[in-house]
Amino acid sequence: MKTQTLLFTFSLVLLMVATQTEALLGGLLQSLLGKRGLLDNLLGKRGLLFGKRALTNQDLFDLAYDPSLSAADMDALEMLLENY
């Protein structure tokens, strides 16, 4: 039972890592298959399956919506940034 739990936990963590970043899985497979491997078209820089999109910092979108700002605050910000 301990082995099954350990394997399940390991596979769950591996699945979470693989879905959160495309770089880990792509880099691992590309290093195993070489520069001109069988799946080079899918894993290359211009590949269809794995790209560098997940490597970009997408945390800046967290600040795009701030629920603590009121409508008056938004109007004041729009007026301040109007000529910026």
From Swiss-Prot:
Gene Ontology biological process: regulation of defense response to virus
Broad class of where this protein is predominantly found: secreted
Residue span(s) of the pro-peptide: 37-84
UniProt modified residues of type Leucine amide: L33
Keyword presence, Cell membrane: no
GO cellular component, one term: extracellular region
Signal peptide from the UniProt entry: 1-23
Location of the protein in the cell: Secreted; Target cell membrane
Tissue: Expressed by the venom gland.
Keywords in alphabetical order: Amidation, Antimicrobial, Antiviral protein, Membrane, Secreted, Signal, Target cell membrane, Target membrane
Similarity remark: Belongs to the non-disulfide-bridged peptide (NDBP) superfamily. Short antimicrobial peptide (group 4) family.
Function description: Antimicrobial peptide.
Further remark: Shows a low ability to inhibit hepatitis C virus (HCV) infection in Huh7.5.1 cells.
Name of the featured protein: Peptide Ctry2346
Biological source species: Chaerilus tryznai
